[in-house]
Amino acid sequence: MFLCLLCLFVAGFSPQEQGYRVVKSYPHDRDAFTQGFEFRDGFLYEGTGLVGRSSLRKVNLDTGQVVQRFDVPQPFFGEGITVLNQRIFQLTWQSQTGFIYDKSSFRLMGSFNYSGEGWGMTNDGKQIYMSDGTSQLRVWDPATLKEIRRITVKDGVREVTALNELEFVRGEILANVWQTDRITRISPADGKVLGWIDLSRILSKAERPGPDAVLNGIAYDAASDRLLVTGKLWPKIFEIQLLPKK
């Protein structure tokens, strides 16, 4: 009996929340309904959503200035993006259509299709990871955009659903969870939740324009080891440093 109870306890164990500190803040476009967020070669690449307002942007982090932009045509609702091999991939929400752009010119190179909804994207340099609002992450071959496998994300025995914007950071996948201000740290090998980061206090309610203005945007500057976070319609981007677990 003791061993059975011990097994249940271990199986249901929830990883500890990890603390953070704000290093610096940067300006962010208050009209950007952020759905995709990556940092490459000194610039932010941001995908925004809403029909008629969806876009792909190249942004100067320090000034917040949009230096390059492609407006996604209606009726598409832009979602997550990822930058790989001089190309930018962008999902759409319910149209089952994604777009491929040339990284330098933002020229639309082509499109691709997938089943279900498109939410978030990231890559590890070799494979693309995609979220669809469930507890599963799809792993794609970037050359063919065909699915290789799926990963079910679990915190103990509980599946973590509504996985949204993604970022590959130091060998882990960091994921926003829709309608929360929490980030979950995920093992890409087996989907195990390695920890949580609660950012509910990083931006006051007074600075948020409404209930849809939730945390959604994680970007990692690998060259400088900087972790950046923002949210939909947020006025700021925050550089944060994760604190060692106690």
Predicted regions and their residues:
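A short helix->beta-strand "capping" segment at the edge of beta-propeller domains
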Residues: 14-31, 61-67, 71, 200
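Beta-rich, blade/repeat-based domains predominating
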Residues: 30-41, 74-84, 114-127, 131, ...
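Conserved beta-strand positions in repeat-built beta-propeller and related beta-rich domains
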Residues: 45-50, 88-95, 130-134, 175-179, ...
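Short loop/turn segments that connect beta-strands within beta-propeller blades
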Residues: 59-64, 102-106, 142-145, 187-191, ...
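Blade-loop segments of beta-propeller domains
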Residues: 63-100, 106-118
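Hydrophobic, well-structured mid-protein blocks that either form specific transmembrane helices
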Residues: 98-156
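Loop/turn-rich, solvent-exposed surfaces of beta-rich toroidal or solenoidal domains
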Residues: 158-192
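Blade-level signature of beta-propeller repeat domains, shared across WD40, Kelch, NHL, RCC1
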Residues: 219-246
